[in-house]
């Protein structure tokens, strides 16, 4: 494969083809070398394609899959009971090297289970971890895990830290600062798993481990890679998104209270738009599953067109950076 081909689970998420197909058409327009394989119920996909103008069908394929994994479906049921689900067929395209990556807005637990089953993990990795950039005062940091692994051992946190550091390096961060999210920065703080993980990371050669970080330190940009279990990470991510929406919403409301406030708001509108763009979850949508023998990107289930397009951008960048192969090479040095 010379061109970058991304398999899209067109049935995933809250909106399915109605949102995903237009996002794919926009992505094709944005990246002239991109090819997409839309996987799902072909009649529904074709119906949405017919509503789009300027579709380049030479860079777009439709793969029919008769089954859909529901957002509330148990991972075990998805794994055993739906061999022709759109999510699974999209992952199979990656395994068969007919696509370089898979993007899905579907059921997170099912996507993780199927990804591990179909693509397998890299040597030395027990569990893949979900990672995504989140905005900070200094730009962004990479946070993992974001919900794929609710219960983690110290060894899992250690592996997440190694994978996060290597991914950050691959994506352009020189000697990334790695920290464990904790309730304090002192050595005595934290539960047993976090303390054990810290002791392991202190012994890791070639890793720039800076110790513990608190929640406010994440947003000050005190670390480039922040590691926690999926329970904590998912709560932090969702709270961040909610807080960003509340702040921008409150500012807009204040600028509409009275003539003077409206005048000030009109002058400040360019800055407000910039702030909203910087904090918008759509801009940062796309969580990578690190540790697999292939590229899988999870989009937010409630993602709209712009947001899903961001997830496609994330997958394309990882394809261009050859992330799994580079990750495998560095993990051999650090873990094996």
Swiss-Prot record:
InterPro entries: FA_synthesis, Phospholipid_synth_PlsX-like
Pathway where this protein functions: Lipid metabolism; phospholipid metabolism
Keywords in alphabetical order: Cytoplasm, Lipid biosynthesis, Lipid metabolism, Phospholipid biosynthesis, Phospholipid metabolism, Transferase
Reaction catalysed by this enzyme: a fatty acyl-[ACP] + phosphate = an acyl phosphate + holo-[ACP]
Subcellular location: Cytoplasm
Classification via Pfam families: FA_synthesis
Top class in the EC scheme: transferase
Gene Ontology biological process: fatty acid biosynthetic process; phospholipid biosynthetic process
Superkingdom of origin: Bacteria
Enzyme Commission code(s) on record: 2.3.1.274
Coiled coil: none
One GO term describing the cellular component: cytoplasm
GO molecular function, one term: phosphate:acyl-[acyl carrier protein] acyltransferase activity
Statement: the UniProt record of this protein carries the keyword Cytoplasm: yes
Biological role: Catalyzes the reversible formation of acyl-phosphate (acyl-PO(4)) from acyl-[acyl-carrier-protein] (acyl-ACP). This enzyme utilizes acyl-ACP as fatty acyl donor, but not acyl-CoA.
Description of how the protein assembles with itself and partners: Homodimer. Probably interacts with PlsY.
Family: Belongs to the PlsX family.
PANTHER family: FATTY ACID/PHOSPHOLIPID SYNTHESIS PROTEIN PLSX, PHOSPHATE ACYLTRANSFERASE
Protein name, UniProt field: Phosphate acyltransferase
Lineage: Bacteria, Pseudomonadati, Pseudomonadota, Gammaproteobacteria, Pseudomonadales
């Amino acid at each position: 494969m010379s061109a970058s081909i991304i398999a899209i689970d067109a049935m995933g998420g809250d909106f399915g083809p109605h949102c995903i197909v237009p996002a794919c058409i926009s992505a094709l327009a944005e990246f002239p070398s991109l090819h997409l394989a839309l996987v799902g119920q072909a009649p529904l996909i074709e119906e949405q394609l017919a509503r789009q103008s300027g579709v380049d069908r030479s860079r777009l394929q439709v793969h029919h899959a008769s089954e859909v994994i529901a957002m509330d479906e148990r991972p075990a049921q998805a794994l055993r009971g739906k061999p022709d689900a759109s999510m699974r067929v999209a992952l199979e395209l990656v395994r068969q090297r007919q696509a370089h990556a898979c993007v899905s807005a579907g059921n997170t637990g099912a996507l993780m289970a199927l990804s591990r089953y179909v693509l397998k993990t890299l040597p030395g990795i027990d569990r893949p971890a979900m990672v995504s950039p989140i905005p900070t005062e200094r730009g962004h940091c990479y946070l993992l895990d974001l919900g794929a692994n609710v219960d983690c051992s110290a060894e899992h946190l250690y592996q997440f830290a190694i994978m996060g550091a290597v991914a950050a390096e691959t994506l352009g961060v020189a000697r990334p600062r790695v920290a464990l999210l904790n309730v304090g920065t002192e050595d005595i703080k934290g539960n047993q798993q976090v303390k054990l993980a810290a002791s392991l990371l202190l012994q890791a050669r070639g890793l720039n481990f800076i110790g513990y970080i608190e929640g406010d330190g994440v947003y000050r940009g005190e670390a480039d890679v922040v590691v926690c279990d999926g329970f904590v990470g998912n709560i932090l991510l969702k709270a961040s998104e909610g807080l960003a929406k509340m702040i921008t919403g409150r500012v807009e409301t204040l600028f509409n209270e009275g003539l003077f406030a409206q005048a000030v708001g009109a002058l400040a509108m360019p800055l407000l738009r910039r702030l909203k763009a910087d904090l918008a979850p759509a801009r940062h949508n796309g969580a990578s599953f690190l540790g697999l023998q292939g590229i899988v990107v999870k989009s937010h289930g409630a993602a709209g067109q712009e947001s899903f397009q961001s997830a496609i951008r994330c997958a394309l960048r990882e394809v261009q950076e050859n992330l799994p192969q580079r990750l495998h090479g560095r993990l051999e040095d650090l873990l094996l």
